Amino acid sequence: MATTTAAAASGIFGIRIQDPRPGTGRVQARFGFSFGKKKPAPPPKKSRQVQDDGDRLVWFPGANPPEWLDGSMIGDRGFDPFGLGKPAEYLQYDFDGLDQNLAKNVAGDIIGIIQESSEIKPTPFQPYTEVFGIQRFRECELIHGRWAMLGTLGAIAVEALTGIAWQDAGKVELVEGSSYLGQPLPFSLTTLIWIEVLVVGYIEFQRNSELDPEKRIYPGGYFDPLGLAADPEKLDTLKLAEIKHSRLAMVAFLIFALQAAFTGKGPVSFLATFNN
């Protein structure tokens, strides 16, 4: 009876039923409601070979990388001191007793632990199996790193050309009005902020509509005008170089922020003071 009912429900609610203990008659159900038409999942990417020899580069000499950082990701140096990238584990329960002929129905026991597969399975609502999984963290690392590279270069260039530290640039805009390369702009600072919010927000909405994890972080096309990624043999080298520069830029901008907070100087003026 229970099997027949579960089979009928599977066609309505999209339940996947499997037998966790063959021969015991127990069943397990995982509910997956779907709204609208699902996009087909992208073809699986060819996984990189895991570096399992003793010559693997790690973030600190002699450090032991955690098991979930196996070297398969580009730029993986085994650094995860807080275990943020550890795969989530879920308890697997048996069905509660629902026999109307019994005086008492007992709750289902814990029959095991489920760990999500490392294989990425996009859905219409999210591109990753785990919202806070290691693939999601890699995407965030790259995007923050790209912003940090732009910010670091901008902070140095602006101070070198104008003599105004990056943390004081907003004050100048409030006093003298908005300008670009010395030329006044016909917009107030508030208008410029709204323009930035709308433009960046639109770009982020478009990026988040992409379900292919590879295209989310490496879109190509207009973002590769020189066609540097056209050569598959050089692609991994370029990805490694980008993640290295991203990490360096994030550390550099953190130093810029601490420097501004404690000394009130920008990177160029602080370097000049240090040299003197």
Swiss-Prot record:
<keyword id="KW-0809">Transit peptide</keyword>
<feature type="transmembrane region" description="Helical">
    <location>
        <begin position="248"/>
        <end position="268"/>
    </location>
</feature>
<keyword id="KW-1133">Transmembrane helix</keyword>
<dbReference type="GO" id="GO:0009765">
    <property type="term" value="P:photosynthesis, light harvesting"/>
</dbReference>
<keyword id="KW-0793">Thylakoid</keyword>
<feature type="binding site" description="axial binding residue">
    <location>
        <position position="245"/>
    </location>
    <ligand>
        <name>chlorophyll a 4</name>
    </ligand>
</feature>
<dbReference type="GO" id="GO:0005794">
    <property type="term" value="C:Golgi apparatus"/>
</dbReference>
<dbReference type="GO" id="GO:0009534">
    <property type="term" value="C:chloroplast thylakoid"/>
</dbReference>
<dbReference type="GO" id="GO:0009535">
    <property type="term" value="C:chloroplast thylakoid membrane"/>
</dbReference>
<feature type="transmembrane region" description="Helical">
    <location>
        <begin position="185"/>
        <end position="205"/>
    </location>
</feature>
<keyword id="KW-0460">Magnesium</keyword>
<keyword id="KW-0472">Membrane</keyword>
<dbReference type="InterPro" id="IPR001344">
    <property type="entry name" value="Chloro_AB-bd_pln"/>
</dbReference>
<keyword id="KW-0479">Metal-binding</keyword>
<dbReference type="GO" id="GO:0009522">
    <property type="term" value="C:photosystem I"/>
</dbReference>
<keyword id="KW-0604">Photosystem II</keyword>
<protein>
    <recommendedName>
        <fullName>Chlorophyll a-b binding protein CP29.3, chloroplastic</fullName>
    </recommendedName>
</protein>
<keyword id="KW-0603">Photosystem I</keyword>
<comment type="function">
    <text>The light-harvesting complex (LHC) functions as a light receptor, it captures and delivers excitation energy to photosystems with which it is closely associated.</text>
</comment>
<feature type="compositionally biased region" description="Basic residues">
    <location>
        <begin position="36"/>
        <end position="48"/>
    </location>
</feature>
<keyword id="KW-0597">Phosphoprotein</keyword>
<dbReference type="GO" id="GO:0046872">
    <property type="term" value="F:metal ion binding"/>
</dbReference>
<feature type="transmembrane region" description="Helical">
    <location>
        <begin position="147"/>
        <end position="167"/>
    </location>
</feature>
<feature type="binding site">
    <location>
        <position position="247"/>
    </location>
    <ligand>
        <name>chlorophyll a 1</name>
    </ligand>
</feature>
<feature type="binding site" description="axial binding residue">
    <location>
        <position position="242"/>
    </location>
    <ligand>
        <name>chlorophyll a 3</name>
    </ligand>
</feature>
<feature type="region of interest" description="Disordered">
    <location>
        <begin position="1"/>
        <end position="53"/>
    </location>
</feature>
<keyword id="KW-0157">Chromophore</keyword>
<dbReference type="Pfam" id="PF00504">
    <property type="entry name" value="Chloroa_b-bind"/>
</dbReference>
<comment type="similarity">
    <text>Belongs to the light-harvesting chlorophyll a/b-binding (LHC) protein family.</text>
</comment>
<feature type="binding site">
    <location>
        <position position="181"/>
    </location>
    <ligand>
        <name>chlorophyll a 3</name>
    </ligand>
</feature>
<feature type="binding site" description="axial binding residue">
    <location>
        <position position="141"/>
    </location>
    <ligand>
        <name>chlorophyll a 1</name>
    </ligand>
</feature>
<keyword id="KW-0150">Chloroplast</keyword>
<feature type="binding site" description="axial binding residue">
    <location>
        <position position="59"/>
    </location>
    <ligand>
        <name>chlorophyll b 1</name>
    </ligand>
</feature>
<feature type="binding site" description="axial binding residue">
    <location>
        <position position="144"/>
    </location>
    <ligand>
        <name>chlorophyll a 2</name>
    </ligand>
</feature>
<feature type="transit peptide" description="Chloroplast">
    <location>
        <begin position="1"/>
        <end position="29"/>
    </location>
</feature>
<dbReference type="InterPro" id="IPR022796">
    <property type="entry name" value="Chloroa_b-bind"/>
</dbReference>
<dbReference type="GO" id="GO:0009579">
    <property type="term" value="C:thylakoid"/>
</dbReference>
<feature type="binding site" description="axial binding residue">
    <location>
        <position position="204"/>
    </location>
    <ligand>
        <name>chlorophyll b 3</name>
    </ligand>
</feature>
<feature type="binding site">
    <location>
        <position position="207"/>
    </location>
    <ligand>
        <name>chlorophyll b 4</name>
    </ligand>
</feature>
<dbReference type="GO" id="GO:0009523">
    <property type="term" value="C:photosystem II"/>
</dbReference>
<feature type="binding site">
    <location>
        <position position="79"/>
    </location>
    <ligand>
        <name>chlorophyll a 1</name>
    </ligand>
</feature>
<dbReference type="GO" id="GO:0016168">
    <property type="term" value="F:chlorophyll binding"/>
</dbReference>
